[in-house]
Amino acid sequence: MSLDTAIFAGGCFWCMVQPFDTYPGIEKVESGYTGGHVANPTYEQVCSGTTGHTEAVKITFDPDKISYKDLVEIYWHQTDPTDASGQFQDRGDNYRPVIFVKNDEQRKIAEKSKKALQESGRFGDAKIVTTIEDVQPFYPAEDYHQGFYKKDPQRFALEEAGGRQQFIEKYWKNN
């Protein structure tokens, strides 16, 4: 079994773990920070907006069971790709939506998927602003952030209630 990785940023990383964690072929979903200029940042540093990092998830998967293309589709269903300034109640550059790609194959898949989403008209005239960027070093978040939806389901539910679930239902309910 040869495993691969994918990195996605879509707002609060707490809300990005559970949607991927439930699929066959997903070996691990890790919360962390990427895209910035500070090595080994802390949560507090990232939240301060001074590191350039965004909260993200690193997904380790078996491409024989789930494809990178499938992961990109799951990603779109978890984010507001028309909002470059954060996601839902989480605002700021550290919550920006990004698909981090590690090679030309991932880039082609992500760009094709983004173009198809734009052309679908699902979001009306709104532009799909999620960026596709080269992968940067990924720094795992502190242990208390890992698998947060399992550790603190009540607090996780409050985070999910901040507009994400309503958005998903509005735009993806029948899909």
Swiss-Prot record:
Q: Which NCBIfam families match?
A: msrA (TIGR00401)
**Which GO molecular function annotations are given, in alphabetical order?**
L-methionine:thioredoxin-disulfide S-oxidoreductase activity; peptide-methionine (S)-S-oxide reductase activity
- Record's InterPro entries? Met_Sox_Rdtase_MsrA_dom, Met_Sox_Rdtase_MsrA_sf
Q: Which reaction does it catalyse?
A: L-methionyl-[protein] + [thioredoxin]-disulfide + H2O = L-methionyl-(S)-S-oxide-[protein] + [thioredoxin]-dithiol; [thioredoxin]-disulfide + L-methionine + H2O = L-methionine (S)-S-oxide + [thioredoxin]-dithiol
This protein is called what?
Peptide methionine sulfoxide reductase MsrA
What family is reported?
A: Belongs to the MsrA Met sulfoxide reductase family.
What positions does UniProt annotate as the active site of this protein?
C12
**Cysteine pairings via disulfide bonds:** none
> Which Gene3D superfamilies does the protein's record reference?
Peptide methionine sulphoxide reductase MsrA (3.30.1060.10)
Per UniProt, the keywords (alphabetical) are: Oxidoreductase
Q: Which gene encodes it?
A: msrA
List its EC numbers. Answer: 1.8.4.11
Is Cell wall biogenesis/degradation set as a keyword in this record?
Answer: no
Q: Which residues cross the membrane?
A: none
GO BP terms: protein modification process
Q: What class of enzyme is it?
A: oxidoreductase
Keyword Protein transport assigned to the entry: answer is no
Q: What does this protein do?
A: Has an important function as a repair enzyme for proteins that have been inactivated by oxidation. Catalyzes the reversible oxidation-reduction of methionine sulfoxide in proteins to methionine.
Q: Which domain of life is it from?
A: Bacteria
